[in-house]
Structure formats: structure tokens, C-alpha cells
From Swiss-Prot:
One of its GO terms (cellular component) is cytosol. PANTHER family: PEROXIDE STRESS RESISTANCE PROTEIN YAAA, PEROXIDE STRESS RESPONSE PROTEIN YAAA. Pfam families: H2O2_YaaD. Belongs to the UPF0246 family. This is UPF0246 protein Cbei_1739. InterPro entries: YaaA.
Length: 260
């Protein structure tokens, strides 16, 4: 079984985990090509392209100018990514067994690096998958990556007995590999997290992000291989809601005022 998640916009390179190995990302050549294109953008044009503030544009212009494919100043991506999903994952409390299970079973989609394993070393960057970066005749990153990401994941998953994918990525990122759903022996399960608000269950983005991280960690810590066991997830007051679920979507709900 494979878990798919999105990266985070925020990176923290202040800490380095010397006990973990560091590996090279598979799509390093593509990352280099994208960075070379992004180096052509000045602060103002990067601000417009990424729809970010002038301050963030300046920061990321500098990042791209200084970017290196070398692992010398890199960090393992699972340790470096921050944000709500990664707060839920909470790698700081992982055992070595958890880390290595994650490296085998967790994949992080990335606008720059394509597909990352947790131990893959990354350098500072910001590039969301939905960015309309034109390069080499491709109008955006979805076109640029094409079937490369699906092919990479399929090679990985073909060696597994359980060929299920647990989709804990955002729509923006899973869209890059959405056609994987049409491949015969692949089953894609998407956990969805909803809060009870104003008389109905709704997806509250920031809470859903953290819940996706909690579910990711639940799978990793418990070494789950049976999809039925996902229904046992009950962190932060969430419970499996059979009535709202179907074969493809597992819905977990909670009353925000009655957290555990």
C-alpha cells in the first residue's frame, strides 16, 4: 500500500537529522531544468507567476539563483517540510522503524521534484504544482510532468502485493496523477475529513490538512496494510462515518465542540 501526500510551502532547514540516510530525488534532471527556467524570472515576474507577496518573491528569486542539486546543504524532505499536514505527521516523535517504513511507503508529490521519497534530499524552493510555468512548449507543470509521475509510482507499486493507494494529497497535487485511477489493478482510496458546522458536515481546509497528516502518521506508526484498518482511525475526535462514505471515499467526521 502506498500513501500519497502533498508537500508544504514552508520549509525548515534549521535542523539536520544525521541519523537518517539521504538519497537523491529521482527527477533531479527535471528539477534542474525547471530551476534554470525559473532563474530567468526577476522579483516582479516571479511575484506575478506565483501570486505571492513581494517579500516572498524576493526570497524565492534568491533561492532559485542559489539552488543546487548537491546534497551538501540539502535536508531530507520529510524532515524539512512544515505546515499543517506535517504538524499532523509529527516526524519528531518517530522511531527509526517509523522513518524507514515511511520511506518505503510514503510518496510526496512536488512541483519541482516530481515525486519524493521521505529520505530524498531537497534544497530550498517554492513551486506549487498549479503554477502556470511555461517551459519547453509545455503550458504548465501538469503538462510538463505528463505521465512521468504516474510511471514512476507504477514502477514502485508493481512490486507490492497490496496495490492500493491512499490519497491524502490535495486536489491540486493529486490532479497530476489522477489518471492512475483508470489503471486496472490499482485501487485509490481517499480519506475525507469533515467538521459539523451549522447543521451539516463540511470540509474546513486547515483542519482537513492536519487530519490528513494525522492519518498519514496513523498508517505509518501502525504499519497498516489492510484498507479496512483505516476505518479505525479516531484521532482528534474523528470517527469513520459509514453513511457518508463509499468504496472510493472514506469519510471521517467530528463535532468540533466535542474533541477527544
Amino acid at each position: 500500500m502506498m500513501i500519497i501526500i502533498s508537500p508544504a510551502k514552508t520549509l525548515d532547514f534549521s535542523k539536520f537529522n544525521e541519523t537518517l540516510p539521504m538519497t537523491k530525488p529521482y527527477f533531479l534532471n527535471e528539477a534542474r531544468e525547471l530551476v534554470e527556467e525559473l532563474k530567468k524570472y526577476d522579483n516582479f515576474s516571479l511575484e506575478k507567476l506565483m501570486k505571492i507577496s513581494p517579500k516572498l518573491a524576493k526570497l524565492n528569486t534568491q533561492r532559485f539563483q542559489n539552488w543546487s542539486e548537491s546534497l551538501e546543504s540539502a535536508r531530507q524532505c520529510l524532515v524539512a517540510f512544515k505546515g499543517e499536514v506535517f504538524k499532523g505527521i509529527d516526524v519528531g516523535s518517530y522511531t527509526m522503524e517509523d522513518y524507514f517504513y515511511a520511506n518505503d511507503n510514503l510518496r510526496i508529490l512536488s512541483g519541482l521534484y516530481g515525486v519524493l521519497k521521505p529520505f530524498d534530499g531537497i534544497n530550498l524552493y517554492r513551486l506549487e504544482m498549479a503554477t502556470r510555468l511555461g517551459i519547453g512548449g509545455f503550458k504548465n507543470l501538469y503538462d510538463y510532468w505528463g505521465n512521468k509521475l504516474i510511471d514512476n509510482i507504477m514502477k514502485d507499486i508493481e512490486r507490492r502485493e497490496n496495490k492500493a493507494i491512499v490519497n491524502l494529497a490535495s486536489y491540486e497535487y493529486f490532479k497530476a496523477i489522477e489518471d492512475i485511477k483508470t489503471i486496472g489493478d490499482i485501487r485509490v482510496i481517499t480519506p475525507i475529513f469533515k467538521e459539523y458546522r451549522d447543521g451539516e458536515y463540511k470540509i474546513i481546509t486547515i483542519m482537513a490538512k492536519r487530519a490528513r497528516g494525522l492519518m498519514t502518521s496513523f498508517i505509518i506508526r501502525n504499519k497498516i496494510e489492510d484498507l479496512e484498518e483505516l476505518k479505525e482511525f479516531n484521532h482528534d475526535g474523528y470517527e469513520f462515518n459509514e453513511e457518508l462514505s463509499n468504496e472510493a471515499d472514506l469519510v471521517f467526521t467530528r463535532d468540533i465542540h466535542n474533541r477527544n
